[in-house]
Amino acid sequence: MAALLLRHVGRHCLRAHFSPQLCIRNAVPLGTTAKEEMERFWNKNIGSNRPLSPHITIYSWSLPMAMSICHRGTGIALSAGVSLFGMSALLLPGNFESYLELVKSLCLGPALIHTAKFALVFPLMYHTWNGIRHLMWDLGKGLKIPQLYQSGVVVLVLTVLSSMGLAAM
């Protein structure tokens, strides 16, 4: 808004042969400010008892929606995990072998180790397979609603199978 006003004033000054008194004398004051508009909007909504729009309770959860949220969550978690691992490798004393020996000395059962490995690899596999799904969308493939659900199920099955395979190693 201010840029438009400055452009108008500048053009008017150029037309008036750089006469500053004509520019100031013919300037049009603004009707309302953004703050006044915002206050009027919120007062109107509060007065009519409207909920915030769109209200979160009107959405029904669907597979593509849940998978999109989980894809973002796994991306954040993997990013944080890699950063935490890198910082701990730099700051903690000792080397990787000493920490591996520490874990081996705890005598954890194979079921617990397999479960922990599965829990570590599952977000990576989910983010990888769902990322490939997103790349297919970038190519314009699989964008129809039935295909969204089919590819979602394929991603979940591939995630579980590849996670189990990697955890078994």
UniProtKB/Swiss-Prot annotation:
TM region(s), chain numbering: 66-90, 111-139, 147-167
Pathway: Carbohydrate metabolism; tricarboxylic acid cycle
Alphabetical list of Pfam families matching this protein: Sdh_cyt
InterPro entries for the chain: SQR/QFR_C/D, Succ_DH_cyt_bsu_CS, Succ_DH_cytb556, SuccDH_FuR_B_TM-su
Task performed by this protein: Membrane-anchoring subunit of succinate dehydrogenase (SDH) that is involved in complex II of the mitochondrial electron transport chain and is responsible for transferring electrons from succinate to ubiquinone (coenzyme Q). SDH also oxidizes malate to the non-canonical enol form of oxaloacetate, enol-oxaloacetate. Enol-oxaloacetate, which is a potent inhibitor of the succinate dehydrogenase activity, is further isomerized into keto-oxaloacetate.
Organism: Homo sapiens
Self-association state and partner proteins as the record states: Component of complex II composed of four subunits: the flavoprotein (FP) SDHA, iron-sulfur protein (IP) SDHB, and a cytochrome b560 composed of SDHC and SDHD.
Family membership: Belongs to the cytochrome b560 family.
Binding site for heme b: H127
Record's protein name: Succinate dehydrogenase cytochrome b560 subunit, mitochondrial
Cofactor binding remark: The heme b is bound between the two transmembrane subunits SDHC and SDHD.
Gene, per the UniProt record: SDHC
PROSITE patterns in UniProt: SDH_CYT_1, SDH_CYT_2
Keyword Heme: yes
Cross-referenced CDD domains: SQR_TypeC_SdhC (cd03499)
GO BP annotation list: aerobic respiration; mitochondrial electron transport, succinate to ubiquinone; proton motive force-driven mitochondrial ATP synthesis; tricarboxylic acid cycle
Mitochondrial matrix topological domain: 30-65, 140-146
Membrane topology: Multi-pass membrane protein
UniProt keyword terms in alphabetical order: Electron transport, Heme, Iron, Membrane, Metal-binding, Mitochondrion, Mitochondrion inner membrane, Transit peptide, Transmembrane, Transmembrane helix, Transport, Tricarboxylic acid cycle
Cellular component GO terms, alphabetical: membrane; mitochondrial inner membrane; mitochondrion; respiratory chain complex II (succinate dehydrogenase)
